Amino acid sequence: DQDFYVSKSNEFAFKLLNSWPKWEKNFVNLIGEKFSGKTHLINIFLEKFKGIKIEANEINNEFLKKIKVFENIIIENFNDKIDENLLFTLLNIIDQDNKYLILTSKNPIVDHSFKLNDLNSRSKNFLLCNIEKPGDDLMFALILKNLSDRQISIDKKLVDFIIKRIDRSY
């Protein structure tokens, strides 16, 4: 938690996850590009509120049995390789047992074209939580942290110079 830098680009996601269980919906889709901090946020959430986490392509019937004792279920890296029938069953279990689901993905689940029509309508029930591209403040913090992790010190003016010219991605 202490080495997660909250900025304008990730503040909504950080606050939403920390406001559990006072969410509008039990289904949250945490959206962000690779390295945007989704997994870091999920790990902070799990440390605080407990739960079970699995990669989307690893969901199986055994996992569906395991979740019974958990209130919070995390599906990481949702993609088109997911077993739609298992996902549908999972959503039904979460709905019926009043559990919570956080699904991380690069793109909103609502933009996905499911073969199962019921999943297309269910995907509209997710609260979408987007991590935006990093602003100057976050880029500054990320650069300093990466350099510090490697025990490299650099003049802050040089970091400012880099920030003005760097690509806005993670």
Positions of the model-derived regions?
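Dynamic helix-loop-helix/coil hinge segments at AAA+ ATPase domain boundaries and subdomain interfaces
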Residues: 1-12
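Conserved AAA+ ATPase "sensor/coupling" helix adjacent to the nucleotide-binding pocket
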Residues: 141-152
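Pre-Walker A adenine-sensing motif
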Residues: 10-22
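Walker A/P-loop nucleotide-binding motif
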Residues: 25-41
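Conserved AAA+ ATPase "SRH/arginine-finger" region at the nucleotide-binding site
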Residues: 111-112, 126-138
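Conserved P-loop NTPase "ATPase switch" module shared by AAA+ and STAND
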Residues: 66-86, 90, 97-106
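Short conserved motifs of the RecA-like P-loop NTPase core
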Residues: 153-165
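Short regulatory helix/loop adjacent to the ATP-binding pocket of P-loop NTPases
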Residues: 109-124
